[in-house]
């Protein structure tokens, strides 16, 4: 299976939203990480409505973004998760340390 990830970014002042579509796996996670620019961002939102697969490599990208936002005093939210993606976040304990809906 060919891994594909579409990344659409919108920024409004200190708020930045990433709308992601496709798969986040060991092939596409580096692409996502390279596209996350947090300088001056106070509120970071990842919209995962279009994500149908998330691997540990993708989880690591979100954990790194959360850590960076915490150190900068900003906020991060992950929204519109499909049930199986929400279940994965819950199973690994991310729902205890991140704002995930």
Question: Where are the model-predicted features located?
Answer:
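Amphipathic alpha-helical interaction surfaces in cytosolic regulatory modules
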Residues: 26-97
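Short acidic-hydrophobic, aromatic-tinged amphipathic segments that line or gate anion-handling sites
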Residues: 99-101
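Short amphipathic beta-strand starts and helix->beta connectors
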Residues: 1-4, 60
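STAS-typified acidic loop motif
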Residues: 3-32, 53
């Amino acid at each position: 299976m060919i891994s594909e990830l579409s990344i659409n970014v919108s920024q409004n002042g200190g708020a930045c939203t990433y709308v992601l579509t496709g798969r986040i796996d060991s092939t596409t996670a580096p692409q996502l990480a390279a596209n996350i620019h947090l300088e001056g961002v106070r509120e970071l939102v990842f919209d995962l409505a279009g994500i149908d697969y998330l691997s540990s490599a993708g989880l690591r990208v979100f954990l790194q973004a959360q850590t960076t936002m915490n150190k900068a005093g900003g906020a991060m939210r992950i929204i519109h998760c499909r049930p199986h993606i929400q279940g994965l976040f819950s199973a690994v304990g991310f729902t205890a340390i991140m704002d995930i809906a």
